[in-house]
Amino acid sequence: MIENSFKMEMHFKNRWQAASLFLRYPRTVTLCLSGKSGDMDESVNLSTSMGDVEASMLNHNVSFSSTMVTSNGDLSLPKLSVTLSAEEILKLRSGRPKNAVESPHAGVPMETSLAAEEEANGDEEEESVRVVDIEDTLELTSNGNEAKPEDQELAIAPVLQYFQGALVELGRRCWTSSTEAQHYTKGCYWSPDGTCLLVPVHLDGMHVIEMPSDLYSADTVQPARSLTKLQSEVHVPEGGTVYDCVWYPHMNSLQPETCLWLATRQHEPIHMWDAFDGSLRCSYSGYDAVDEVMAAISLAFSHDGEQIYAGYKRCIKIFDTSRPGRFCDDYPVKFAISCIAQTTAHPHTLTCGNWHGYIQHFDLRCSHKQGPLFTLGGHKGGITQLRYGEFGNGEWHLFSGARKCDKILQWDMRNYKQPLVELQRHVDTNQRIQFDLASDSNWLASGDTRGFVNVWDLKKYGDPSVLPLHSDCCNGVALNPAMPILATSSGQFHFTDQSAQGDNVTLNGTETTELPAPADVNQNQKEVLYENAVVMWWCGQTG
């Protein structure tokens, strides 16, 4: 309540003037409509109204649904008149509780009270500066040197050195295949803290594999290190073909509530899975025009983790992470969204790839009728992956890959008329072949259908280093964000003739099974080589 004897008139043309006054003077005054100051029952608390206005401004989100557009009539407030008479002030004073604390500036003019408060704030700032003065907090040792805090060295993240020598295999996990069930991997994804690896497997769900425990504190690895048999700590059984999956960006194994990932599967809504026990936490459902559940094609978290971007055949749905269910904002598009990428510098824009081979950049604050801000081409197949890399001074480069396309295109987003660099790899199938960028944006690694891993040094832009790591298609490549460890996954769907019973089938490159052939079947034999594996490699310094 106001304790000062003053009288003022305020007229607001709109809510923005009222909100600006409230932010400058966040006090509680009495608001009377139509200039009626004598009747206190008709008064309205201005702080409550201005609080609602401020919350309305701060929560003013862009709506992508035509039914959620706010009319212009809702953006204006009637002219308000505020009048405080001496009788009202006395009435307010007499109505205070008995145990109320008397303000030290009660009964003085408002200008004097504000001056006293500013002087008190100045004294507090001087006292605060004196208390936290850096000279008072330094500790000196006996020889006069300044003592360093114990955690100062831990606060500085070490610079990871990738590909400093020959790769050392750390461990692997294999899945068998047959002509009836081909369990090939579909990529691999390191968690943001680098402790575990997510591996989707065809007809076998999703697996979470932990990094070997002896590597957490390792600076170097001996070439003669014994192999670790990688095991699945969490297994989510197959419920449908996995289209895409993504980790929560702030995942930390020391905080179990953050250990989760999203996955979209065939004929299912988006599911959030717990990385500790594999339980289902919640679901985010997208529905079509006839109210049937649609499966998302691609997924992405916002960098703060508060929103989920899901790409569908004709729209982008934006879910609030804290609100599971079907409530979302729709942003209509013309093509199916096959992959999504975003920069930290522009949280309101999305870069999306589609099955027609185009890359489109959308500003979600604009109407969908405006269309994309720009469209990029250059690939002959559908876009399978997009990845942004920061090269310092706010310089963002976009890397794009496509199916049945041997090129990885690097785009400078300051001038995107043509690609900056074309990086060549070998991709001759429709399968998604992953590539990954190092945390310092100095190295780019990609698999190919021949089983090789191509590594480019982005500081030199020379020919890639070709590493023959697999005997089957290398579909997944992931660089650990916390350790110099490279994870690769292999496997693909092999087209075999079910009637050709005389084929030689090789499982994971270790054993060969020759099936008997009946007399009436052609004896032409065909060798089919399967290698469905995920392997971890040490790519740092070796001892």
UniProtKB/Swiss-Prot annotation:
InterPro entries according to UniProt: SWT21/TCAB1_mRNA_Telomere, WD40/YVTN_repeat-like_dom_sf, WD40_repeat_dom_sf, WD40_rpt
Segments of skewed composition (Acidic residues): 116-127
Keyword Repeat: yes
WD repeat windows: 237-283, 291-329, 378-421
Cellular localization per UniProt: Nucleus, Cajal body
Region named Disordered: 95-128
Domain of life: Eukaryota
Entry GO MF terms: box C/D sno(s)RNA binding; protein-RNA adaptor activity; RNA binding
Keywords assigned: Chaperone, Nucleus, Repeat, RNA-binding, WD repeat
Any one Gene Ontology BP term: Cajal body organization
Record-level GO cellular component terms: Cajal body
Family: Belongs to the TCAB1 family.
Function description: RNA chaperone that plays a key role in Cajal body formation. Specifically recognizes and binds the Cajal body box (CAB box) present in both small Cajal body RNAs (scaRNAs). Probably acts by mediating localization of scaRNAs to Cajal bodies.
Record-given protein name: Telomerase Cajal body protein 1 homolog
